[in-house]
Amino acid sequence: MIINAKGPASFAEKYIVRSIWDNKFPPGSILPAERELSELIGVTRTTLREVLQRLARDGWLKIQHGKPTQVNNFWETSGLNILETIADLNPEGFPVLVDQLLSARTNVSAIYFRGALRNNPDQAVDVLAGIHQLENTAEAFAEFDYQLHHRLAFSSGNPLYVLILNGFKGLYSRVGRYYFSSSDARALALNFYVELEKLALAKNYIDVPAVMRSYGINSGKMWQRLRDDMPADIAQDKS
C-alpha cells in the first residue's frame, strides 16, 4: 500500500480509510486492538486515538465506550464531507464521481434557483449583475458560478441547500476550473446567466425550471466532450 501523507496522523487516517475501501477492514468488522493497530501503522497510540475519533465523526467507524471499534458501511453513515476522500481513494472512478456530482447539483439547483427568484428576486438580480463585469477566464467563471449557486441557495429561503453545496465545494472548484477552460463552455454558461438575469428582472420564477433543464442538458453534453481529457490530478486535493 503506497500512501502519501503529510504526517503521522494523516498517514494513519489514510491507512485506515484505504483499508476500509479495499475491504481489508470490511463493514461490520472489528478493528484490531489499539496497541496492535498502532504498531501495525507505526504511530503512537495517542495519535491513533485522535485519528479514530475523527474517522468516527466522519462516519467511517463506530466507537462505543467499553466495546471494540467497529467499521461502518460508510455509504450509509457518512456525508458529503467524504467526497474528497473518495476521489483520492478511487482516481480511476473519478470521472464517474464527477458525473454523479454534477447531476446531483443540477437537480438540486433547479429547486433553489426557482426559490431564490420567487422569494428574493432583487437579490438574484444583484448577484447576476456580476455577469457584466465577468472576465473571460476559467478561474473567473468557476468562481462566479460557485458564488452564484451559493448566494441563490441562501436567497431561496432554505439554508440547508448551502450546506449541500459546501460538501461539493472542493471538488467542484477544481472541476469547474477545468470545465471553464473551454471557451465553448464559458459561452454556454454566459448565455444561461443572461437568460436567468432576464427572468430575475421580470420576477419570473415560473420559467426557471425550463431554463435550468435546457442548460443542464447542454452543459451535460459539453461535459461529455471534455471529461475524457480531464487531468488525473484534479482528483487530488493539493490544499
Curated annotation (Swiss-Prot):
Residue ranges crossing the lipid bilayer per the database entry: none
SUPFAM superfamilies, alphabetized: GntR ligand-binding domain-like (SSF48008), Winged helix' DNA-binding domain (SSF46785)
GO molecular function terms attached to this record: DNA binding; DNA-binding transcription factor activity; fatty-acyl-CoA binding
DNA-binding region (UniProt annotation): 34-53
Signal peptide: none
Domain HTH gntR-type: from-to ranges: 6-74
Gene Ontology CC: cytoplasm
Superkingdom as given in the UniProt entry: Bacteria
Keyword set includes DNA-binding: yes
Protein name, per record: Fatty acid metabolism regulator protein
